[in-house]
Amino acid sequence: MNFQFIPLIGFNTSMYIALDHEFMSQALTEASKSLYLSNPNPRVGCVVVRDGKALGRGYTQKVGGAHAEVQALADVRANGFHPEGSTIYVTLEPCSHTGRTPPCVNELIAAKPALVIVSMSDPNPLVAGKGLEQLRAAGIEVRCGLLRAEAEALNRGFISRMTRGLPWVRLKIAASLDGKTALADGTSQWITGPLARADGHHWRAQACAILTGVGTVKEDNPTLNVRDVDTERQPWRVIVDSKLETPETSKVFDNLDHSGVILVCGKLDTPEKERCAKVFEARGIDVLSLPNANGKVDLPKLFTYLSQEREMIEILV
């Protein structure tokens, strides 16, 4: 899938030395620590360096918490150093707008580094090169583009939401070598092995929501939660159910205080459907009516809703 990225300013791989690649790789390692944590914010890492030595490092925390640059600068000071005259490696252009937190670019300017090296520019229209411009206006040298592909790979969902208004959707599917997905008598709980299941929970933990259909809920009665992954955050559970036929006793409704459920239906055009919707809503379950022309769930509208109204960047199906 092709995205339209903001043109990079000063992108030239020849301007970087081996140490630059090493420390930006370390910044990317920091960014990977945000995989299960920072949604819907991008996964960002930062390393502050002077004379070939890392003075501090950080990565973006959960929503409302410190961004990578702020974490790294705090780490520098906690380690007894100062950032003035340093080189700062950061995997995403520093934000220049006030959202849930103040602009990171202000923190960087106040730190007075000599050089800031950035992997990728920010596709958020509120930033879109403004962070780089402000750093340059403050007299700080800026370079952009080092290990850009790696930084983009960590942020496919964020890029998709910013450039297309849609989340990045992953489809997990498993089949045997003969093309089967289950035994005919329904006795097969899994056809995948432990490594594949562990991989599946990694993708669950990374997602903002796990989406499935009412047929799967009826047949398998899944919990749709994350297990065996070191994360406090559980993704939303989204059930596509045109006729509101999801059994009220389904396991997917367990632990609603820890992970929410969105039931997406077609038209609420019968008294029974309206009754079911009220019962679910009374339990704290969100019921969303998004009918298409045939009265079923309008999937394009659903993905737009999840991106724009719920700020979701990655969906696992």
Predicted regions and their residues:
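Short, basic/aromatic recognition patches
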Residues: D20-N39, R161
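Residue-level signal for inorganic ion chemistry
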Residues: A27, G45, C95, L135, ...
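Short beta-strand scaffold segments in enzyme catalytic cores
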Residues: V44-R50, I173-A174
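Zn2+-dependent cytidine deaminase-like catalytic core
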Residues: V48-E150, W236, I262, G266-D269
